[in-house]
Amino acid sequence: MLDNCYYINRHYRYIGYIDERTLQWIEKDLAFVPKDHLVFVSMHIPSSSTKELEFNALLPDETSNASSLYDLLKGYEAHLLTGHTHNNGNVVFNDSLMEHNTAAVCGTFWKADICTDGTPAGYGVYEVDGNKLTWRYKSAGYPIEHQFRAYPVGVSEDYPEYILANVWNCLLYTSPSP
């Protein structure tokens, strides 16, 4: 678990940043990890900002020096486990690097049991079997099979002729890859 909330003043203003000491520690630690092992890195703020995971223009939504972390993870199959956005999404950067940005167990800051992207409050479930990873989102108060909501034609003013679905354990692909 990395602390990438880097405070820049006394008024709780912070940016997403991994300090040099932590990067050096990761590099030394990875020297003992075989390249054929899965690597997981957990941190609060996402490594990269995507439109789909956009949070709040007033708060940092990416780690400013994430490329340094990506460089250290080259050669490994790596998964970044992040939060902060109160949205849910899985971003595939390339064949060996993926970020799982998991919605919040508190929903929208404990004010609603639904997150800002419509995902119910909940948490990620990750299962590792050797080098095989499976994951899914577990909505609080619902069975594990509860993975989306569908809305009938006519519900949306913007898309009145469409059936809409809010799927909260989807994959997003981004380029260029880190």
Feature-to-residue mapping (PLM):
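Flexible, acidic/histidine-containing loops and adjacent segments that form or flank the divalent-metal
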Residues: 1-12
